[in-house]
Amino acid sequence: MLESERPERDMEEEGEESNEEEEEEGMSFSDPEGFEDDISDEELLGDILKDRPQEADGIDSVIVVDNVPQVGPDRLEKLKNVIVKIFSKFGKLTNEFYPQAEGSTKGYIFLEYALPAQAQDAVKNADGYKLDKQHTFRVNLFTDFDKYMVIGDEWDVPEKQPFKDFGNLRSWLEDPDCRDQFSVIYESGDRTSIFWTDVKEPVPVEERARWTETYVRWSPKGTYLATFHQRGIALWGGEKFKQIQRFSHQGVQLIDFSPCERYLVTFSPLMDTKEEPQAIIIWDILTGHNKRGFHCESSAHWPIFKWSHDGKFFARMTLDTLSIYETPSMGLLDKKSLKITGIKDFSWSPGGNIIAFWVPEDKDIPARVTLMQMPTRQEIRVRNLFNVVDCKLHWQKNGDYLCVKVDRTPKGTQGMVTNFEIFRMREKQVPVDVVEMKDGIIAFAWEPNGSKFAVLHGEVPRISVSFYHVKNNGKIELIKMYDKQQANTIFWSPQGQFLVLAGLRSMNGALAFVDTSDCTIMNIAEHYTASDVEWDPTGRYVITSVSWWSHKVDNAYWMWTFQGRLLQKNNKDRFCQLLWRPRPPSLLSQDQIKQIKKDLKKYSKIFEQKDRLSQTKASKELIERRRAMMEEYKTYREMATKLYMEQKTARLEIRGGVDTDLLDSNVEDWEEETIEFFVTEEIIPVEE
C-alpha cells in the first residue's frame, strides 16, 4: 500500500514544481526584447556620481603668483623652499609649476592647493606680500583669468545717482548762544528726545517714539546719532535729524566709531559662520559699504578693535598675537601680525601712532611694558617689571603721559602694593618716574589737558583722594590729600582743572566738586542712588542721573554748574539714559585760546548782559505763549459751540421734543470768578 502511494506523491510533487515554474515565468522581472531604460545614471547612481572628479576642481584650487624673483637653476631650489614656507600656511600644496625660459624662471608661478577654499585664503592673505624691496607678490585665482578675458568691449554707463542733501551736519555748532545738545531716553526706552541745554529748563529740539530699540550713541565728534534696531544700525544727523545711513547687521548689540568718524564697527553674536565671518563688521560710514568681516572669540572684551588716534590703524589682541590693520585696505600691516608671547593688554596713544602693551613674567624673564612706534614697529621704550600681578594702561588725553598701574607683591611680604609708572612721552628716551602706594586703589584718572592726576585709594569707610602733579623736571609732587571721602569714581571736566568725586550706586550718590588749581572742595552735595555722571563738552555743566536700567524708582536727571550749584531737577518717567553731544576739536590755536582766557574779564560783561536780556526775553516769550494758548482755546470753543447748536435739532428728536439744554443750564447757580496774574518786565537803560 505504501509502495502504491509513492508514485502518486511523486506525481503530485512534480505537478507542484511545474506549477511554480509556470508562476515564475508569469512573474518574470526580465526586460522584454527591445526595451530601452529611460532612467538616468544620476537617478540610479546619484550618491556615487556626486563624488566623481569635476573638470573645474583642479582649476578652482590653482593660484597664480606674479612678481616672483627670476632665478637660474642654481637658486631655484632655494626659491622653492621660500615659496613653500610662505604659501603652505594657507593649506596643503599638491602641485607647483615654475615656468622657465632661457635658463631662468619667468617671474610667475602656479600653485595648486588641495581645496579651493585654501586657494581663496591664499589670495586673500598673500596678495601684496612684500618678499623684499624689489618683489611684492600679486596673487590671483587661475579662474579669474578666464573671467576677465570674456569681458565684453561694450560698456554700460552706470546711472547717475541723485545727490542726497542732508543739510549742515554740524548745524548745532552755529547756535548763537553756544549751547550744547544732549539726548535723553525715557519711558523705559519707548521715547527718545534731543534737547538744547538751558539754565532754566531744557529746550526740546526733536522727540520721537521708538526711535531706538535699546540705546543710542553719539559719534566721537557729534556728527551722527546712532540708534539700535534688531536688523542693524541707523545714523541720524542734520538740523532735523534725518536718516543719513543705515547698516544691516541682524541682532547687533555693540558698536564703536573710529576717531575720524569714517568707519563704524558693529558686533552681533547671531551672524558668525566659519565660511564667512560676520560677527564683527567694519563699515564705511560715507558709502555704507561692508569693508570687512571678522570672527569673534568668546573670551574677547569690547571694544575688540582699538583705533589709533587718527583712524589710520586699528588693532586686536588674540592669544600670543597682536594684529594691526591699516585703512582703507583693512588688511594686515605689512601682511603679518606681531607674535608677542603672553601679551595681556594693549592701548593706543591718543596723541600719536604709538602702541603700548604689557607682557607678564615667565619664569626668570621679568614682566615688561613696551612702547612701539607704528607703522615702523620700532620699540621706543621697554620697561622691565618684577613680581607683577597685574597692569593697567592709562593714557593722558593728549598723549603727553602714560601711567602704567602696576600691582605687585614684593618678596618677603604677603600684601600687595601699587606702583604708578609715569612715562613722559614728549621727552627724549621717554623717562619714567614712579609713585608707590600701599593702599588699595579704587580709581585713577588723568586731568584731560594738564599734568595732574587724581587717585582714590583705601577701603570703606577710610577712602582718601590724592592729587599729584608731574612737574617739568620730572618730579611727581603730592599736591593735596583728603581723607574720609564717600567716592568710588573720578570725573574730570573735559577742560581740566575741575572734577567731581562721586559715590555712585552703593554709595548713595555722594558728590564732591573740587577745584584742583588750589585743591579746594567747592561744594558737597548728594543725588540719592545716582548711577551716572556726565560732563558737558565745555565743562560748564554736570549732569547726575538715576537710570531706570539700574534703579526702578526716583528716575531723574539733575543739572549742576561746575561749582556744584544745582540748577535743575528733571523727572522723567522711567528715565534710562542721557548723553551729551560731543564737539569736534576747536579750530583755535593754543595762542588764540590763551588770549581769550587773558581777556575773559572783558567778555564776562558781555555775557552777563546777554543773561539779563535772555531773562527779559523769556518773560516776553511766556506772555506770547500764553496769548497763543488763549487764542487756540477761543478758536476751539467757537468751533465746539457751533457744532453743539447744529446738533440741537437731533437732540430734540431723540428726547421727544424736551429741550434738556434749558433743564441742565441752571444759569442762576453759576459763579463768575476773575483771575489776574502779573508778569514783571525789566527795563535796562542803554548807555550812549
UniProtKB/Swiss-Prot annotation:
UniProt protein name: Eukaryotic translation initiation factor 3 subunit B
Subunit-structure text: Component of the eukaryotic translation initiation factor 3 (eIF-3) complex, which is composed of 13 subunits: eif3a, eif3b, eif3c, eif3d, eif3e, eif3f, eif3g, eif3h, eif3i, eif3j, eif3k, eif3l and eif3m.
Organism from which the protein derives: Xenopus laevis (African clawed frog)
Biological role stated in the UniProt entry: RNA-binding component of the eukaryotic translation initiation factor 3 (eIF-3) complex, which is involved in protein synthesis of a specialized repertoire of mRNAs and, together with other initiation factors, stimulates binding of mRNA and methionyl-tRNAi to the 40S ribosome. The eIF-3 complex specifically targets and initiates translation of a subset of mRNAs involved in cell proliferation.
Biased composition (Acidic residues): 10-26, 33-43
Coiled coil: 589-640
Cross-referenced SUPFAM superfamilies: DPP6 N-terminal domain-like, RNA-binding domain, RBD
Pfam family, one: eIF2A
Molecular function GO terms recorded: RNA binding; translation initiation factor activity; translation initiation factor binding
Subcellular location: Cytoplasm; Cytoplasm, Stress granule
Positions of the UniProt region annotated as Disordered: 1-43
WD repeat boundaries on the chain: 164-206, 208-246, 248-293, 297-335, 338-373, 436-492, 525-570, 635-680
CDD domains: RRM_eIF3B
PROSITE patterns membership: RRM
Family stated for the protein in its record: Belongs to the eIF-3 subunit B family.
Cysteine disulfide links: none
Gene Ontology terms: cellular component: cytoplasmic stress granule; eukaryotic 43S preinitiation complex; eukaryotic 48S preinitiation complex; eukaryotic translation initiation factor 3 complex
Keywords: Coiled coil, Cytoplasm, Initiation factor, Protein biosynthesis, Repeat, RNA-binding, WD repeat
GO terms classed as biological process: formation of cytoplasmic translation initiation complex; regulation of translational initiation; translational initiation
